[in-house]
Every structure is written in structure tokens, then in C-alpha cells.
């Protein structure tokens, strides 16, 4: 999947977020400039809020999971472990899946 940053449409639609993979995030990070790498995080954040407001729990959980992964693996800002833990916990509250549980364990280690 080719992830696109758009200021005209700064959200992912549900179909896109559910089809997106961790490899898509990794490829985007490797191919994009620093500004777009950060913009992706904020598009995920905006999408999370949009899906939560619409009670689209699975899509919201996927956004939170991607945010946890992206913070923990790609961006690694100060406090990345704590921030990633916050978002993976949020993902699990919305949609408790084995994939999210495994990431919660990985982040905790």
C-alpha cells in the first residue's frame, strides 16, 4: 500500500486503515522525508479521534496500534516506550486481539 499524506483529507478512511500493515508503515518511513514521517503520526492521531467519535472501534483500535508501533519502532522520540504503551493499551481497550496483546508484551520488555 502506498501511504499518502494529504492536507486536504488528513484522515485515513476505514477501508485503508484496516488494509494497512506494519510493513506499509516501515516502507513509508524509509521512503519519506522527516516532515512527512511526523505527519503520518498526526494523520493516524486524527483518524483515531474520527473513528472513536463514530464508534468505529476496530478502525480506531488499528490506528492506536499503528501509533504505538510507529512511536516504538520508527520515530523513537523521548518517552517512546511510555507513549507506545499508552496507545497499545488504548488499542486493547477498543479491540482486544492477540496481535495487540503481543505488542503490549514487546513494549513492556
Task: Set out the residue ranges of the language-model regions.
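N-terminal leader/capping segments at the start of a protein or of a new domain
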Residues: 1-7
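Amphipathic alpha-helical repeat scaffolds of TPR domains
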Residues: 7-35, 57-73, 98-106
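Helix-turn-helix repeat elements of alpha-solenoid scaffolds
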Residues: 33-47, 77-83
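Flexible helix-coil transition and linker loops at the boundaries of alpha-helical arrays
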Residues: 45-60, 91-101
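Alpha-helical linker/edge segments of TPR/alpha-solenoid repeat scaffolds
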Residues: 48, 108-109
Amino acid at each position: 500500500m502506498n501511504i499518502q499524506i494529504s492536507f486536504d483529507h488528513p484522515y485515513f478512511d476505514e477501508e485503508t486503515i484496516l488494509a494497512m500493515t506494519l510493513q506499509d508503515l516501515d516502507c513509508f518511513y524509509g521512503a519519506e522525508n522527516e516532515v512527512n514521517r511526523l505527519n503520518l503520526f498526526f494523520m493516524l492521531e486524527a483518524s483515531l479521534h474520527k473513528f472513536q467519535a463514530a464508534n468505529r472501534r476496530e478502525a480506531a483500535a488499528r490506528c492506536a496500534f499503528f501509533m504505538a508501533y510507529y512511536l516504538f519502532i520508527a520515530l523513537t522520540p523521548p518517552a517512546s516506550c511510555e507513549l507506545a504503551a499508552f496507545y497499545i493499551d488504548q488499542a486493547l481497550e477498543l479491540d482486544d486481539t492477540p496481535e495487540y496483546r503481543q505488542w503490549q508484551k514487546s513494549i513492556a520488555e
